Amino acid sequence: GSEMCIRDRKEYAERGYIHAVALDLSKYFDTLNHEILLNILRRNVRDERVIQWIKRYLKSGVMENGVVMETEEGSPQGGNLSPLLANIYLNEFDQEYQKRGVVFVRYADDIVLLAKSERAAKRLLETSTKYLEGPLKLKVNQEKSRVVSVFAIRTFKFLGFTLGKNGKGIYVRVHGKSWKKMKSKLKELSSRRSVQSIRPALAKIKVYMCGWLNYYGIAEMKNRIEELNKWLYHRIRMCIWKQWKKPRTKVKNLRKMGVPEDLAWQAGNSRRGYWFTTQTVAVNMAMTKERLISSGFYDLAIAYQSVHVNC
């Protein structure tokens, strides 16, 4: 799986394989050669009926402008069988480069070859391109395929991750684009405009972040997650504060939650904005972490600690 690929990449970097060849295949699913794929299958599948069934599947065509067009190459994207066939096709690459003694990591059509020197990596880029475009008849995107350092966070990303290095050694981290995408989604889910009811909103956030952390939990990001957690608590408090609307309602609800009358009145009648007011003592006394968690808040710091320990 993806987690094993990331672990492998980290271990290889620790052994000195710090130069990567990031290969980008142009329209991979659309360019699988049917004849090559069927010949690969025939080497392992003796029942010709199965081969013919797969052949019909491959030639079932694609939809273009509402019309089904037969195809001579490619595998129907979205088909249940397509990912398996695509993986079988690139297994030829795996076998060849294992014979050559090359260190590499592949997940689906994401291929990264590793070398200990930049010179060796450049040779690998050249030879791997020839093999993919020759015997396998695929197309390598020359503009996107490159030799980079495994620590180059701006130019090197594999399955949403990259590697970092500090005094303690090499560690896995979330790539900047992956983090930015996640935070943008959280902003959307915790927007004061979109949140009509708190519990359903918290449930959506939990579903999204549970999946995200299960995938990215292998990365080292304790401090970043704690900061993100504080930020999310604050945004949820703003959503609740907005829903209370009138000053009288705000004061009443704060008092119900145990806030002293003077602090409740001061916060409830404040003319300051949501961001400022929800940082006051009164609001934080009322909307404690424990109270929000009991309402369904998914504490990111607690969740991360749990999944990271188990990685």
Feature names for model-found ranges:
Residues 7-155:
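Conserved polymerase palm-domain catalytic core
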Residues 70-76, 188-192, 215:
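Short hinge/gating elements
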Residues 59, 135-203, 208-210:
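A conserved non-catalytic segment of reverse transcriptases
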Residues 94, 129, 133, 187, ...:
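Structural signal for well-ordered, non-membrane alpha-helices
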Residues 28, 41, 45, 80, ...:
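Generic amphipathic alpha-helical segments used as scaffolds and interaction surfaces in large
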Residues 235, 244-311:
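Extended C-terminal regions of large enzymes
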Residues 201-247, 251-255:
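Non-catalytic, peripheral interaction segments enriched in hydrophobic/basic residues
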Residues 1-5:
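Short, small-residue-biased leader/transition segments that mark boundaries at the very start
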